[in-house]
Amino acid sequence: MSSIRAPGVYFEKVEDRLPPLGLGPTGQAGFLGLATRGPLHEPVRISSTQDFLDTYGAPLHEGFLAEAVKGFFDNGGKVCYVVRIAHTSARSPEGCAASSSATLQDRLGQPTILVQARSEGTWGNEIRVDVRTPPPAVQALLVRDISPGENFAQIRSGRGFQVGSQCRIYDGAQERYVTVNRVEGKALFWQDPIDVGFKSSAPTFIEPLSFEIEAQVPGYKERFTDLSLSPASGRYFARFINAESQLLRCVDQISPSPFPQSLPQEASRLMLEGGADGLADLTPHDFIGYNKGPGDRRGLGALEVVEDIDLIATPDLFAARELSRGRGFRSDKDVEIVHEAMITHCERLKDRFALLDLPPKAGFDRALQYRLLFDSAFAAFYYPWVVVPKEGRKRRTIPPCGHIAGVVARCDADLGVHNPPANAIVEGIVDMEMLLNDDHLGQLNHQGINCLKYAPARGIRVWGARTISSDPDWRYVNVRRIFNTMRRALEQGTQWVVFEPNGPTLWKQIHRTLHTFLEQLWLKGYFQGATASDGFYVVCDKTTNPPENIDAGILVCEIGIAPVRPAEFITFRISQHMEDRASEDSMQR
């Protein structure tokens, strides 16, 4: 209170605090590639090389994804998202990735459980399954007689019983089976009354019946005990195994046999079979994919829903060309189709940047020829391929995109998005596929190919930061990524504007918020100019919001920035629809 007043209820107007704007995380890559195992067409957050190996298994001999992800983390990357690619087709299962499986029979020979490998691939053909029905872990003594028509029992101890326990009641002369639906201390209840009576003096025992499944591959074993066929049980096999297993997923076939004949038969050394990698028939469409909504996304379409991604890379495109043996990928033209789709993906979402690889063993002329097929500010080529160490003294040549993504992430963290990711050392490589002389470096850089250069005593470094755009205003990677990062920040940070009264008060609030945000970026070196007004401007008033816009429910704020390179102003124009939202880039020379 500003002054002492008489006791009572008072109302004070407090100015709302608007959410501050800020740049979100950058340098988070989305990788599409081939792997031994792991979920297909599903983006998985990966935070280390070991995390990748735990999820996707040992590196695939024919692919480059594992080495690319390792290169990302070796060079300073912190988080990436991986989408495993394989051939999948709704039209025909032939040539498609498939999970290994085996069907368990019940005691009457009816199918009761479908056991599958956790993910598609031939890796699942090495899974061995054992099924056992062990003796009951607990046995409770009946302490009160059960009369015919009753549905409960009093026992000496309720330990080991739970909702969903499938139990045997027996006295040596007869037996019945019930599924517990309630446990109250030492009392067990079930749904259907039993048709016979049991005497506590017989004696009568009640015991839960269960089974166990053990799965193993060379070097790893897992065992699941006390499993139940009842969906009401906390140990219901399908739910429990699917949540806990690294190897299996199970499907309840719902046996028609009565319990306990519906329990699976014991099995020893049962090998899963039928797994397929789906690599020989890979097509460009497997990488491009689609986004038809939750549960129906493939390839690039699966990455659309991951908002944090701002870099994308596909290290296995040329591996797919070799694996398909001329069926799905017939030539570099098919690789070109995927590269074009990656560029379109980034241009459409407007907050991502594609890191592209040139063909392996491409000489100067071939590299230049392939690069000139594209024109976009949302992508960059890096060249040549790099040599990485393998176990022992072996080496392997791989595309550079994963290592470059890590360099970009490191530069973002250390210097900021506005600094070009160039003249930065590339960690984790021991050589390059070919060494380029200064003449080649100059010509390739001029044409928008970012080369790797060996500098004596300074290691192998990224020696360029150009996009593949023919527009000089978008020549540099950092300029495009400044806009990408700002766009994302502005779109996310101005959500509060929608449905607010469109008038001078709102315009002033927006102007203040945006000016503060841009001033902070200018102080960090994102924009040129000795003063803030030299580096950016913000206009949000009646000149950008005439009556016809207000009547149409549209709010327009105009932002101009002078990025550190090039030196011209480039206008960033944001149109806010009060019922919805839209944004656009425009240029001002």
Place the predicted regions along the sequence by residue:
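Structured, hydrophobic secondary-structure cores that serve as assembly/anchoring elements
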Residues: 1-107, 113-118, 170-173, 216-219, ...
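A short, compositionally biased
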Residues: 109-111, 159-163, 204-212, 555
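Short, cationic low-complexity segments
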Residues: 137-139, 234-240, 578-589
